[in-house]
């Protein structure tokens, strides 16, 4: 590439896309600065010189956020960026998924792709710029890579598709789709939607692919100008004679073992065959490298046989038809003290979801590069090792768990009631208790049931299903409800969630170079059929959301005040609102428009807090009568509390019809007085009169007589 700076530009969805090479990060194998509008992302690709002694492709993709990109200084004492945000982790996964299938089988050199977000224009996606830059950094480098790929965001406003919609357009859009692929095929889809029909989702994907082709042509132009010659990489290969020997020893027995229907029995049967073959090689005293290759050959034989049975004989490992769903069952209300719970079981995959309702003050505060500051609906996914019958450390959530949690959140968010209709913060936690594939989709089903059990008035129930694919040449088979082995050995994991009306979320990962429209269409239609079957099973357990909330859930009372009165409720340094909270034990959340949410498990305390607030914001009206209480006595008169927080002065001359020499001769502290408001002066001071009330009473009595 040399040291000379090169600049390339095109128009991308009405904004300028500029690529700079040759100036920054020149010691990386490949580096590009991508500028999209005012968004700037530096993407680099680096590879180790020698292959690693591992049995997988060691690729790492990092999307690094820097708060200086939006003019922020990190909070806390350290003032540095800490662990990656959830958004950064999801963006890293988004970039990883379309580039991973485009490295050769047997690639064992470590590859690291890093994108640092240096400037953010909120209307020009930094994730899409980073995906473009990651592909291009690999393509201009000397690292063997079968790209390029590109990705775009697709929205739909007023039934028209939009490439890379602005934030304002996304607010109105019923689709938020990210699609990536090569110039020939699609290899990654990630989407959220408002119950959009499958046909429209497919059109959106294909619409995005047309723009991808243009971006790839732009990358190819840049590579032709500044790309490095690709280096020779030693790929991991297995000796062909050894392969034939192992096949002869194991193939027939593996065929029988693979077709054992129950997961653990099948795994044990396969392990037994593998161990017998390995034992024979160990007797012959082969070296470690040979034994490692024997293990790899055995794993490949299992993979090949599973794939052959599915494509040629339409036989799945557990004996199901290609479009058959595993046995379904569900249950609600398992945990008495939680606000709602749902258990969903599909074959040997089981998820228990718990719904917790909180006040609006319990929202998650977000501190990142986006404009969104808080989140009132959350879905968290946990995958403990016991769910697959294994041991392991209990750590915090990893990338996979965060990704699955976000997918469930995206699938369920469209059916969550608005803050106006249901002023609660909602947190769902899905605990995977058993795993044999499709756990993320089981968590969506369980979470729907948990919300219904909690009494959340959802717009419609959502179910999810994972579709698979086994493709050999032009022959392919689409599988409904894939289990773990089919996910591991197949070519696609296509997760589809939605209601009876349409799709709310999609996620597609593939291990081959890409998929045609025909396969996508078949997978979506087969998924719809499966989703309807699952929804029917779920609704037989609980047909609709419960009418009452759990007695342990907070009760929320909503009231509105004049926004100008908010300061009276809060008081100086929060003194007033803190006193209300201390006296009643409630939580209080105040919106800028004067809407106040009061929450507590005790409804009487909500009402008490409401009464205090009403008194604080109540307006004193001139000419009105009030029954007040004497709070303070001075030589010049008595101060009377009309209601909480509102005092007025009855001057000594206004205490009685006759002349009063001493205030204490007429009233004492604690006395109740009926008084009339005669004036509110420019400083807001309230002047009261008892004399005026007595005069009116006297006149009425005289009229009667």
From Swiss-Prot:
Chain residues that bind Mg(2+): 487, 493
Segments forming domain KH: 554-613
UniProt function note: Involved in mRNA degradation. Catalyzes the phosphorolysis of single-stranded polyribonucleotides processively in the 3'- to 5'-direction.
PROSITE patterns with a match to the protein in the record: KH_TYPE_1, S1
Residues annotated as transmembrane: none
Name of the protein this chain belongs to: Polyribonucleotide nucleotidyltransferase
Family statement drawn from the similarity comment of this UniProt entry: Belongs to the polyribonucleotide nucleotidyltransferase family.
Catalytic activity entry: RNA(n+1) + phosphate = RNA(n) + a ribonucleoside 5'-diphosphate
Primary site of residence: cytoplasm
